[in-house]
Every structure is written in C-alpha cells, then in structure tokens.
Amino acid sequence: MNLPRAERLRSTPQRSLRDSDGEDGKIDVLGEEEDEDEVEDEEEAASQQFLEQSLQPGLQVARWGGVALPREHIEGGGGPSDPSEFGTKFRAPPRSAAASEDARQPAKPPYSYIALITMAILQNPHKRLTLSGICAFISGRFPYYRRKFPAWQNSIRHNLSLNDCFVKIPREPGHPGKGNYWSLDPASQDMFDNGSFLRRRKRFKRHQLTPGAHLPHPFPLPAAHAALHNPHPGPLLGAPAPPQPVPGAYPNTAPGRRPYALLHPHPLRYLLLSAPVYAGAPKKAEGAALATPAPFPCCSPHLVLSLGRRARVWRRHREADASLSALRVLCKGSGERVQGLRRVCPRPRGATATCSSDHQACCIPRPLPLCCKCPPPPLLGQFCSNSSSIRRRTAPTAALPPRARCWAGTCRPRRPC
C-alpha cells in the first residue's frame, strides 16, 4: 500500500555539500530505518484487521475483561457501552436503604413475659384477666408483638401455668365466656425491684397454705360456718336442730338450701372424728343432712375459745391423766341432751369398766349433751349456773338412755346442779 513512498525514499539521490574546509560531504537520510519499521508494523496491523473482517463479517472484537462482544452491543444496540453502566444493574443496594428498612421495624420491648403479664393484670380495674385479654393488652401496647402475634401466645400461656405468682380463678357461674381468669398472688406484689418491670428480685415461690389462710373467692361461697375467719374455729356436726342460734353467732342460710358443714383442719375436728360415737344415744332418722351447728345453750365466745384450747392440749397429751382429767365433763345417770348434738366418748387405754345405772358417760367438752343434774366442771361452772332453767325447757329428761359407758373412777354420785 505504501510501497511507492518507500521506493521514492530509497531512490532519492544523495546531495553533496561542502564543508567549511571545502571538502564534499555526504548527508544520510535520517529516519530511514525507523520509517521502515513503522511501515512494517502498520502492514501487520492492517493484514490482521483484514483477516478478522473476512472471517467474521459484521463483528468487531472489543476487548473488555477478555470477552469478545458483538458490534451492535458495543455500539449501543441493546447493551450498555460503558462497563460502569453495565455493573449498575447488578450492584447491591446501598447500606442506607437497608438501615432505613430496619429502622421502620419496631424494636422488641426489654420486658420479660412475666412483666408483660403483670402489666396487663394491674391495669385492669378488677385485677384479673383472661388469656385473650392479656394478649390483647400486649398487642395494643407494643407494636412489636402486634406484628408477631401468633408466635408468642403460647409463651404467655406457659408463663401463666408455670409461675407461682399467677393464680387461676374459675369463671363465675352464670357468666358465659371461655377460659378462666388469671390474677396475681397477693404475696408477689413486691416481686419487682422498686416497681420497675425491668428488674425482678427473684423467682416467686408460693408457700404452703396454712390452715385458715384467706383465699380470694371469685364468687360468694354458700352458707358456711362463721368461724371460717376465726382464729380458733371448731366444726360442729349434728342433725338439723330447731333451737334458734344466738344472734350473730352464725350466718343465716337461705330457705330451702342445705348449709355446708365446715371442714377445717383443726385439732378439735380430728378429735371428734377419731372418737367412737356413744352407743346408747338415740339415733335420728336416716337421710338427715348436715345442719348449721347449734351453739351451746349456755355458751359464750370465751367458752368456745377455752374449749378449743383444752382440745388442743388433749390432742398433744392424750395419754397423760392430768390432761385427760382437765377435758372431761362428769355426768350422772339421768340428764338432758341438747337437741341437734352428738355425744362422743373417747376412752383412753386401759379403761374397760362399765358404770352402773346411777352413772352416765363422761364426755369431752365439745358439741356434747350437757346434763342439768351433773356437777359442772370448773370451766363450765360460771356459765351453767344461769342457764339451768333454759335447759329444762329445751329437752325432756326421758330422752337420755338409762345406761352408758364411762371411764373407771371418773363418775361422781348424782346430785342436782
């Protein structure tokens, strides 16, 4: 292609010039060899381009990352011409966008499930809630749990069942609904440190309930013994008794409803249940229900308390003669039986003798028949003196059996009270 130029350069004659000395000198053409090298490089590049175009017409090699791309993609026929533009489609989103998405999600509250349940119960006016009510409060108060509602409901249920600080209260009769109520144990009010729900002092453990401990009842109990909250309750069992009780001693029951007998763990009750029933006492008709215990005709609150103390002493020292003699009531052959009460005569070891017709069984001072013709014990003397006329009007003398068992050496001769 450039051959005529090369031949022209070679065929140019050498010009002669004179030196300062007058001698002829030769001038070489500078850059002749360099021009030849450049011509050869251009020829090689042109031949290589010609070969590539002849083999792949319509294609042009674009070296980007060692990959040959079609001409139309390089010139802008559907693909990015700039490598920086090519990578923008597959580039990861910036960190600011991910941070903004995390910021929009609500954070988890720093409270435990026990603290959340306690908040829900305390905000209720009645201080009790069902499981659904507790979950509704937590969802409405904290948006984090609102978005993840079904996942943590079982955790609330497990915490209610496994922690002693929560007490299950049955639903009141006549109030339709599903599920029981849950409340806080009164002894767990100081469970959190300084009222802060973030710090819990220690795991609450419910202690064993003591006899007579007050439990919160969701609805009023049926007619029961008035001594439920008495420090010295004494259950009295017997058949329905017509005598009128002392005003204020026991609650009045509704007509047509059977009152329940108090089953209270008291030493006096164990004493009554473990003692044999007096065999000679007249039996009431079968099917008679438990009635409201009738008080003593000559009784007072001081007498009931004293009898309870004497019964506990006998319970602890029942084999000691000194304690047994303090608990006995001496009776004679004929007397009066208070209607509605039973005669129970426990007998210590070794007592096998039977008294004569002039004597009657010795009894323990509890709801026992009192005789108007027996010497009252020192404890009952101050109360029985003013009530002999009342006892004569309440029960006939012929109601008592002629014979009874008693302990040997404990009965005294008959004498009027």
From Swiss-Prot:
Main location, first listed in the record: nucleus
Subcellular location: Nucleus
Matches recorded under CDD domains: FH_FOXD4-like
Residue ranges, annotated region (Disordered): 1-50, 70-105
Domain of life of the organism encoding this protein: Eukaryota
Alphabetical UniProt keywords: DNA-binding, Nucleus, Transcription, Transcription regulation
Gene Ontology biological process terms in this record: anatomical structure morphogenesis; cell differentiation; regulation of transcription by RNA polymerase II
Start-end of Acidic residues biased regions: 30-45
Cellular component aspect of the GO annotation: chromatin; nucleus
Keyword check for rRNA processing: no
GO molecular function terms noted in the UniProt entry: DNA-binding transcription factor activity, RNA polymerase II-specific; RNA polymerase II cis-regulatory region sequence-specific DNA binding
Statement: the UniProt record of this protein carries the keyword DNA damage: no
Matching InterPro entries: Fork_head_dom, FOX_domain-containing, TF_fork_head_CS_1, TF_fork_head_CS_2, WH-like_DNA-bd_sf, WH_DNA-bd_sf
Basic and acidic residues compositional bias, start-end: 1-29
SMART domains associated with the record: FH
DNA-binding residue intervals: 108-202
Gene3D superfamilies linked to this entry: Winged helix-like DNA-binding domain superfamily/Winged helix DNA-binding domain (1.10.10.10)
PANTHER family: FORKHEAD BOX PROTEIN, FORKHEAD BOX PROTEIN D4
Name this protein carries in UniProt: Forkhead box protein D4-like 6
Source organism per UniProt: Homo sapiens
Lineage: Eukaryota, Metazoa, Chordata, Craniata, Vertebrata
Gene responsible for this protein: FOXD4L6
